[in-house]
Amino acid sequence: MELSLHDRRKEVRKAHDAELTLVVDDPLPAEVRGRLVDISRSGFRARHSYPRFEPGQQVRFRYPASQGQARVMWNRILNGSVETGFLVL
């Protein structure tokens, strides 16, 4: 029996709606504004309009409750917007 994505997650995710700023320096500097979708103890998912994030890429992030560095884990385009999963470092 195959488990759903929700069943395979190691941590509980909580819906969270807040403004978010992501800063990437490589390959080209960019500041990306978006919104949090959900958070967990080790990461978060964000919706934004920047399609160039690549898995493994490191970014700086800032939202009202936290700031720090994170690694891009996945990136997908859905209905004209981009969603990215991040692991907090």
Where are these regions (language model features)?
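Structured alpha-helical
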Residues: 1-89
